[in-house]
Structures are given as C-alpha cells and as structure tokens.
C-alpha cells in the first residue's frame, strides 16, 4: 500500500517535535508498504490545505499522521477524532480557536478505519509502552485526524486514515524528571511496528479499552 506519513513542526516555543523527527527516520519501505513523508505546520488554518494538496496530487491508500503528546508515556494510536477545535494554547500562527466546529457539515466524530488494536498490540510486542487512546485532544492533532475522516466521508471513500501520538523525547524534558519520555530510536521502532500491522485484515478483537 502507498502510505503518506505526516509529522508536525515544533510548537509551544519548543525547538523539536519528536513526531517529525521520528517520521524522517522511517524507512521508505516498511513491510509491503511504500512510505511518503510530509511535514505539517502546527497551524489550524494551514494543515487542511496541505493535506488536500497531497491527496489531490498523489494516490494514497492511507494517510497516517503522527503527533506529539507531551506527558504521555506510551505510543498511542488514536481511535477517534471529534468535531471541535478548542485550543489551550495558540498555534504557530497565534490562532487560538475556542469551541469551534472543524467542519459544519461534518459528523460529530470520525473513527479511524485503520486496525488500531492490531497496531497497538504490535507496538507492545516490541517490548515498548503502547496503548489505545480514545481522545486525540482538541488541538491541531485532533483537527488533522478529524479532517482526514471528513475527507474520507465526503470525497475519498476508499481512503484509510489514522493518527498516532508519541511521547516527548529525553532532550525535551531536561530538568523535568517527573515528565515521561521515550528515546527517538524506540519511537521509530514503535511506529514501524504499527505500520507493519496495517493490512486488509479485520482488526483484533482484544480488550484494550479503559475504565475511565
């Protein structure tokens, strides 16, 4: 399959974003998949245009976006995105939407149509912390996952799409001993395992839910 894997530019006054750093280190061929890579701006207003152009100019079977989730200790495939932008901080264009719908004609939520449980289990099988997430937040990461679901719903019915959040890397938490992190090498290993798990097979039926 032909997969577009995206990562984000740094934001919130940081100099690095592990999502893009990891994406750049992915192999161009992973299993049976051919990988293209795209760096997205951390910008509510710009990401839609970049994704639209990428899909218009290439035939991608799958778009998989990678984002930073500082404070998480595991690599977390996302199950669902919700139709709301509610930014705790401004994006890189100093734009801070509050309680705004992403697409007025969109569904309340869109679920990833990738095998998110198989992907999560594949990460865990590498001996790495992995967990299935049921919230992509309400910042640009959720926005991108929702926009991909919207595009699949309205324009690209065969498109498969998903999102994975990754932790900070150690360089980002200097002086913050209580903040979890993961080496870039392990993030790349985990993402590679998740991508290898993508197939046309049905997702695993295993208990990866949460009680809260």
Swiss-Prot record:
Q: Which UniProt keywords apply?
A: Cytoplasm, Hydrolase, Protease, Thiol protease
- InterPro entries recorded: Peptidase_C15, Peptidase_C15-like, Peptidase_C15-like_sf, PGP-I_bact-type, PGPEP1_Cys_AS, PGPEP1_Glu_AS
GO MF terms on file? pyroglutamyl-peptidase activity
Q: Name one Pfam family in it.
A: Peptidase_C15
Kindly report the protein's main subcellular placement as a broad class: cytoplasm
Give the EC number(s) under which this enzyme is classified. Answer: 3.4.19.3
Q: Where in the cell is the protein located?
A: Cytoplasm
Q: Name one GO cellular component term.
A: cytosol
Q: Which GO terms describe its biological process?
A: proteolysis
Question: What does UniProt list as catalytic?
Answer: 78, 141, 165
Q: Does the keyword Hydrolase apply?
A: yes
CDD domains linked:
Peptidase_C15
Q: Where are the transmembrane segments?
A: none
**Cross-referenced PROSITE patterns:** PYRASE_CYS, PYRASE_GLU
Its recorded reaction(s) are: Release of an N-terminal pyroglutamyl group from a polypeptide, the second amino acid generally not being Pro
Coiled coil residues, start to end: none
Concerning HAMAP family, the annotation shows:
Pyrrolid_peptidase
Similarity comment text for this entry: Belongs to the peptidase C15 family.
Q: What is said about its interaction partners and assembly?
A: Homotetramer.
> Per its database record, what is this protein's job?
Removes 5-oxoproline from various penultimate amino acid residues except L-proline.
NCBIfam families referenced in this protein's UniProt entry, alphabetically: PRK13197.1 (NF009676), pyro_pdase (TIGR00504)
> This chain belongs to which protein, by name?
Pyrrolidone-carboxylate peptidase
Q: Which gene encodes it?
A: pcp
